[in-house]
Amino acid sequence: MSIEFSKYQGLGNDFILIDNRSSHTPLVSPEQAIKMCDRHFGIGADGVIFVLPGTANTDYTMRIFNSDGSEPQMCGNGIRCLARFIAHLEGGETLGKTYQIDTLAGVISPRLEAQGQVKVDMGTPYLLAKEIPTTLGNSNDKVINHSLEVAGQTWLVTCVSMGNPHCITFVKDVWGIDLPTLGPQFEHHPGFPERTNTEFIEVVRRDYVKMRVWERGAGITLACGTGACASVVAGVLTNQCDRYCIVELPGGNLTIEWSEMDNRIYMTGPAELVFTGIYNL
């Protein structure tokens, strides 16, 4: 069996996009997704994204399998890629066009902007420990600058969910962090029953930060959209960032705004088609 695909990337966070509008069930299994994402023996990607029929009042449904076969609730860079892929499927891009996308994290609304940019209404952040979820602190409290022991060190962490869990810690130098060693230990820390994404943040100015990320189920990636959103929220909660902030990632920059008007987070960044092809399953 063969399947058509398109590969997109958002700041180097790359995905295999599949037109799954004919079925409510992904056309590829998690095991097959692992093989497709393999950078030596497959197409190579951080995950596989499926465009399924919409439900209720949504236009489409988004499902994702990570490169390890796990299924996250949402992916910020991925949904920007999804929006441009949908525009291609519909016959072309219309600036200002907004899609209502059903995800496991709720309904997300990406809007097509000029020069390949996509602005996404990421919804409101979840801040209580039980919503992350994490067992750090009291379940009905926010987790802000909480002490966490990892790799023989004490880290001050702030936890935020964007529909998926994030653990954010602020450091002096993001490039001085041993991410391959620390990332897995944060991800699998017993304080996070569903594992966690982990962001290391260096504040350059209140409106500009640098970020490196270890993604749950994907490891080190060049960018993470939900992580950038969660990190700005953490920066505001710890009084280190403004609500409008540029996040510099290894793959490029994202513009994040946590609106005081409606408490929603807006993420703007690029998404680009890399190539299309046919894969033999």
Curated annotation (Swiss-Prot):
Pathway note: Amino-acid biosynthesis; L-lysine biosynthesis via DAP pathway; DL-2,6-diaminopimelate from LL-2,6-diaminopimelate: step 1/1
Native source species: Rippkaea orientalis (strain PCC 8801 / RF-1) (Cyanothece sp. (strain PCC 8801))
Name used for this protein in its record: Diaminopimelate epimerase
Enzyme class: isomerase
Signal peptide: none
Keywords in alphabetical order: Amino-acid biosynthesis, Cytoplasm, Isomerase, Lysine biosynthesis
Subunit and interaction comment: Homodimer.
Species classification: Bacteria, Bacillati, Cyanobacteriota, Cyanophyceae, Oscillatoriophycideae
Gene Ontology biological process: lysine biosynthetic process via diaminopimelate
PANTHER family, per database record: DIAMINOPIMELATE EPIMERASE (PTHR31689:SF0), DIAMINOPIMELATE EPIMERASE, CHLOROPLASTIC (PTHR31689)
Family: Belongs to the diaminopimelate epimerase family.
